[in-house]
């Protein structure tokens, strides 16, 4: 078993940070404590509801939990050197684990991954840390959608996998690529839930007013141009079009 490291930085770069060794109680015994530790160090925002002020976490706690669990379960224990690591920046959190994914990163949602650490996965399921194989990323995506965060970025390096969860960002500050990635994540999540991706659902995802439906159409077009989604039935009129992930056509065929 490799020890989990947690590093918190002062800003958005790695210039200056305090490293904390975590996981001394083991993955199962220390999982709850690690969640509490992260929860206490992540930023919160003050909101007002019914005249009452309260603080709400910037990052959805359920997404953090699933990303930590995935990082532990899917690490490659045969890779030497560093173990799982969580890095906290002012604008993002990075979760890094040894090893590269056993499936295409575009299929993290909707495809059951082969088990790399069967005994560890079964144990963590038995103690209530993880659930059915392949369901973690659906929960992460659902939380990202609910909180209208940018889509997580998955980076595969030579012997490591890194998932970046971004802090909330106004639609106007998201790049074209980030918007297309969010459209793709939305489309995949709805596809595996047997729901349609439409202009209406995209407007709801990004908080776009009904009178600005053309803006939602541009987002869908950009995602298609990027090769991420397809029109389900090209014979259907523009207003009634439904969209699916690019890989769904090959899957049906």
Region roles according to the model:
Residues 1-253:
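C-terminal regulatory or interaction extensions
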